[in-house]
């Protein structure tokens, strides 16, 4: 840590201590997560789930950025140098007399769902989504503290006592570790309500009280749902029937779309609970999606000025010349003939082994038939493989091609589904 100067303590948890540090190299401020665990080797450090997750998920605008990993072999100490944010969600809402505006709530929740979607698409679920682990800096929200994360493909059962009790999903409370990434959406729903109302949704004092608080609000589940929870604990599933009072409307300024998304995120049955990618398409985020699309369009015009000169309507009104239509019909005929001949054999690409510096070697390509025209001798020239040397030289065959170039209008190729 010789390259950093300690400024002050930010917070402390069970497994780590977070300090505000200043880099002596660039002068910038960072958050240093000093691990309390002793590490024996660099292999043990690299196998740490939090480091693996941050490396896989970065860069992303809503995932806390990992700047550097500092490991001292002699002392066995490990520190994660991350970007410094202003505060976490708990600090943001603590002591507030009035809730945030719905516009601000919508902005934060959209970014939280973006972070969850990115994480789940990359095969990771967090398992400890709570206000303390969600960081903000002005209008930017980032998810941090991946110390409890797991792979969505790892074998169940998982650790039973995971995530903070107030944000723990029913399947985590009622099973011996049989839960999925959908638990993150339940936790995010609880955070959603807390940001909007400044009050926790299910503040249970113990596990039994926690499940009771859930039933008080959303009611007891049907037997079909309970049978999905495998390997139940000693806790009895003979719950007295409760209809549920419904989610308390402590704030009158919440829109129907807001409440609709909130109910979808805290669905009792994880199979019926909304996923992160589905939440991003919810009507509640319509304004955010429109703003995001507009921003992307501005960036494209800034980086590709020629696109801004083309009228928008022309992008959907493609016209072909008469010669182009003929070539397109010819191309379709050739493709149909090729399909009748049977599928071509596919070659599997060799797997890359990246270790240190990777050397790239060139290989010769097979001879290709020219599409430029015939040579001086009346025969179709063949382009032979070129070997890279200090000076590129043209072959005699290539020299013959140049004065006899023939121009062709190549047909436009239609891409299915807009893929490139």
UniProtKB/Swiss-Prot annotation:
Positions of region (Disordered): 311-344
GO cellular component: ciliary base; cilium; cytoplasm; nucleus
Enzyme Commission code(s) on record: 2.7.11.22
Basic and acidic residues: compositionally biased ranges: 323-338
Catalytic residues, chain numbering: 128
Effect of residue 161 to F: Loss of activity
Regulation: Phosphorylation appears to increase the enzymatic activity.
Post-translational modification (record): Autophosphorylated.
Protein name according to UniProt: MAPK/MAK/MRK overlapping kinase
Gene name tied to this protein: Mok
């Amino acid at each position: 840590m010789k390259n950093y100067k300690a400024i002050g303590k930010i917070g402390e948890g069970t497994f780590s201590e977070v300090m505000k540090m200043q880099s002596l190299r660039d002068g910038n401020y960072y958050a240093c997560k000093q691990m309390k665990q002793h590490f024996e080797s660099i292999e043990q450090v690299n196998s740490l789930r939090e480091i693996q997750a941050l490396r896989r998920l970065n860069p992303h605008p809503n995932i806390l950025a990992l700047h550097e990993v500092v490991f001292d072999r002699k002392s066995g100490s490990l520190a994660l140098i991350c970007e410094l944010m202003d505060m976490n969600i708990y600090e943001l809402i603590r002591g507030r007399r009035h809730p945030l505006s719905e516009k601000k709530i919508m902005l934060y929740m959209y970014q939280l769902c973006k972070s969850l979607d990115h994480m789940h698409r990359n095969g990771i679920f967090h398992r400890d989504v709570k206000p303390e682990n969600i960081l903000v800096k002005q209008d930017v929200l980032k998810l941090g503290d991946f110390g409890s994360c797991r792979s969505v493909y790892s074998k169940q059962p998982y650790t039973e006592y995971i995530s903070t009790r107030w944000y723990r999903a029913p399947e985590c409370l009622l099973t011996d570790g049989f839960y999925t990434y959908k638990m993150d959406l339940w936790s995010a729903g609880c955070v959603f309500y807390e940001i909007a109302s400044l009050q926790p949704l299910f503040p249970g004092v113990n596990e039994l009280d926690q499940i009771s608080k859930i039933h008080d609000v959303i009611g007891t589940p049907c037997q079909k749902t309970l049978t999905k929870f495998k390997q139940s604990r000693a806790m009895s599933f003979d719950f007295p029937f409760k209809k549920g009072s419904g989610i308390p409307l402590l704030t009158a300024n919440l829109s129907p779309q807001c409440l609709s998304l909130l109910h979808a995120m805290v669905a009792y049955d994880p199979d019926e609970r909304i996923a992160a990618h589905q939440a991003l398409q919810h009507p509640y985020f319509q304004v955010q999606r429109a703003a995001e699309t507009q921003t992307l369009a501005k960036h494209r015009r800034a980086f590709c000025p020629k696109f801004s000169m083309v009228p928008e309507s022309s992008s959907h009104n493609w016209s072909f010349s008469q010669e182009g239509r003929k070539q397109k019909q010819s191309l379709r005929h050739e493709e149909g003939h090729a399909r009748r001949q049977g599928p071509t054999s596919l070659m599997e690409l060799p797997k890359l082994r990246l270790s240190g510096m990777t050397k790239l070697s060139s290989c010769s390509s097979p001879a290709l038939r020219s599409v430029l025209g015939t040579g001086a001798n009346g025969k179709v020239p063949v382009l032979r493989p070129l070997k890279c040397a200090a000076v590129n030289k043209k072959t005699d065959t290539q020299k013959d091609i140049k004065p006899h170039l023939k121009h062709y209008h190549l047909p436009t190729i239609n891409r299915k589904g807009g893929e490139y």
